[in-house]
Amino acid sequence: MARSGSRSDNGLTGIQLEHIGKRFGEVTVLADLSLQVSRGELCCLLGPSGCGKTTALRIINGLLEAETGRIFLHGADITNVPPQKRNLGMVFQSYALFPQMNVFENVAYGMRRRKLPADIIRQKVTEVLGIVRLPGIEKRRIHELSGGQQQRVALARALVIEPQALLLDEPLSNLDARLRADMREEIRRIQRELGMTTIYVTHDQEEAMSIADRIVIMNRGKIEQTGTPRAIYENPATEFVSSFVGNINLFNGTIENGKLSCLGAHFPIDPAIMNPGEVTCALRPENIQFISGGSIRGVVREVSYLGSIIRYKIGLQHSTETISVQTPATDAAYVIGDTIGMTFDPKDLRVFPRNQ
């Protein structure tokens, strides 16, 4: 490992990872991972199971040791600093609350280990329970709380020590869908209120899209793309990102003589975008429109009513391929067996090299 030290702090960087590498046996979990999170930013690490996102979080917190690279917090090198001295708040997937302690004792735990005066501890516990909207429950036992209340207590315990940054490892995965949505809003409110630098790990794309200032898409120990939720969704940099974030149609195409051939139709394409040859095309279901004279023809195979939207599965004529189309529920509805025409704006199409 690199030796500890510091670097010039411009006052803007909260957490910085430089060339982090980690292996478990023969398996490379993180490969030369570099990341910078600004102060006050909520950054989501998003990716499938095994992509390295939780490993990265535990390396930042000091629960795991990286084999290569350095970690900086507000400009200070904390690579070799013990976990308890890194001044980071951590919320685990399991909450890690102490069942034998009441709420007050759980929240006060970190401050008591730091030997703060009793009156200061009481004051801070009261303040932080107010922030997470759980006033007056100091004497309640953990088993008396709902899942959402336990999550708030875990968050209060992480915040009460006034950390320089907050780390959350899939904190909502044990809650039902409605409570997850409510807690996302609460975490975002608290993070903004405190201006807390936050790294939030999740495999749930909706969770990341709704809560993050910036999303980091991880795959096989590497970063595939970094950007705002909108940039990630509308301009995926790789085929993996396009298929992992949101619903999307992936289908084969061919570029030749300045034209893209796909879905039985032909479209002009800028030669600078992609070399001639076979490609994979990506198109969001909501970017396809039904139109009677559309050059793409198909037959409705499935219809799913989803409240505000209707999702269709369309079998393409003269092809074994199917595509999904999503329309507002207020639009004219089609039924299984209908033959329809479709079109889309070529600017909404993303093209990637085949087998990228």
Which functions belong to the PLM regions below?
Residues 33-44:
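Pre-Walker A (P-loop) beta-loop-beta motif of ABC nucleotide-binding domains
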Residues 16, 36, 72, 341-343:
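ABC ATPase nucleotide-binding domain
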Residues 69-77:
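Conserved ABC transporter NBD signature motif
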Residues 42, 83-89, 93-240:
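ABC ATPase nucleotide-binding domains
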